[in-house]
Amino acid sequence: MKIESKLENNALLIHVNFNATEKIEDLEEFKLLVQSSGLIPQHVVQTTRNTPTAKYFIGTGKLTEIKELLNHDPVSVILVNHNLSPAQSRNLEAALGCRVIDRTELILDIFAQRARTFEGMLQVELAQLKHLSTRLVRGWTHLERQKGGIGLRGPGEAQLETDRRLIKKRISTINARLDKVAEQRNQNRRARQNQRTPCVALIGYTNAGKSTLFNRLTRSEVYVADQLFATLDPTSRRCYIPELGNIILIDTVGFIRHLPPDLVKAFKATLEETIQADLLLHVIDQHDPKRHEQKEAVRDIIDELGAGDLPMLEVYNKIDLLPGTTAETYSDENGKPVRVQLSSRSGEGIPLLYAALKDLLSNTVE
């Protein structure tokens, strides 16, 4: 039972600025998410509120404005840069006569498009099903097809109960399969540990340049694109570090602020590869003005995974986009490198990264 990505092209974006700073979502980042999903942001509607309304999330005045806009220039889908309750989604769809997708659903859809491995597809489906289980009253008559009309009555209680049982059964099946995959990964991990090959995990905010750095270090060709979540399935390669020897380098999925909890849980087994690493390379886009917030978002997820105490080297990437910025290494009071500035694309600063890796990993090599 695969829940397919069904997003179409033209979209209207709704962004609400709240006075409470912890609830503010970055609009530009949301536009990147939308574009990464394959949608075209045809309209962007912004509004400011102290709190969301219980019924529509937005106020009735803004709702009327959107209705009039859609009457003149309709779109295939409405995207809200916030997480909606099932009732809010249902009410917006009924009022606007158009499919409504919130931030969590959009990210899940992007992940559904990106997953390529058996494990990745299972993990995405698991997250989708958990999210869907709270929203069966809208958009689904049963699990084999999605309801075509918008704002129609939901399925009967008997059918809903059947759907819930089917979802619960499928979730159980997926978890069992993921457990088997996790055991195989554990065996591979133990084999690496027996060989005493240092393991380094690349982590970072989505689109920070992890895959470009991965390709530079391993001389491989992992898919790279200027879009969010270009890399979803983890990739590991053996690579040679001068004066150190071979290491195992792991490229992981990029993080984002307010990553859906169900998605974090579904990918926890994959992300736990980072917990077993000897060193984390935290790749940061030095060119991005939001880099400090992004850095904290990544650290929050790493802490949640229980990897907050692992040795970490910060890699400030994309210095080629900053005129006057040069490759450089920063060390702590003990002389240990804590930060390297470089360009994965041009290769400037890569020798400094090699030296830092040699310094930090020399005690892990027999």
Task: Identify the residue ranges that each predicted region occupies.
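Flexible beta-alpha connector loops of hexameric P-loop NTPases
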Residues: F18-E22, P52-Y56, R114-E119, Q159, ...
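N-terminal accessory targeting/assembly segments
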Residues: M1-D109
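Conserved G1/Walker A P-loop phosphate-binding module
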Residues: K6-E8, R145-P261, T274-I275
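Canonical P-loop GTPase G-domain recognition
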Residues: G97-G148, L310-L313, D320-E366
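Residue-level signature of catalytic and energy-coupling elements of molecular machines
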Residues: F30, I78, L129, I167, ...
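Conserved C-terminal guanine-recognition region of P-loop GTPase G domains, centered on the G4
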Residues: L27-L33, K67-H72, L84-C98, L244-G245, ...
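Short hydrophobic segments within beta-strands
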Residues: I14-V16, I203, V315
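Alpha-helical coiled-coil heptad-repeat register
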Residues: Q123-L126, K130-S133, V137-W140, E161, ...
